[in-house]
Amino acid sequence: MRSPLLFSLLLVSVSFACKCAQRPAKEVFCSADWVSRARISQSITVQISDGFDGTQFGVEHVEIFRSPNNETFLPDIVHTASHSAACGLSLDVGEEYLLSGSMVNETLHVNSCGQIRPEGLAKEVTGIVIEWSNIPKDFPEEMKKFECPSKDE
């Protein structure tokens, strides 16, 4: 009796999991409002709305590769969903990552489908968001040369 119920629950949870299409790094970069090398300083669970939690990360933007209106400053708080099934990111305090996302009302947001995955990563590098130490050495310079169409087009 428990096996069919457990199987049904697993099937439902898998069907509601976050699914992302793989896209080239430049396409993800150009579709993002902001991209930075970010060091995580804090992680706090916050209530977004009735019954829904989110995670708020304190970040230090070590290097900014893309920002709205080419600003040299980005807010030091980044928001994401608390669960991977809702496309949320899990980030470790003290680690540095290549992060990219959207900016809505001066608030930074990230999700698993909007992360840049450089071509040529070592096979053992897995995961949705890439730790900075695993980014190919030439990729930061490559990002600086990306030419993106205007967001208005």
PLM ranges: what are they?
Residues 2-153:
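Transition segments tied to proteolytic processing and entry into folded domains
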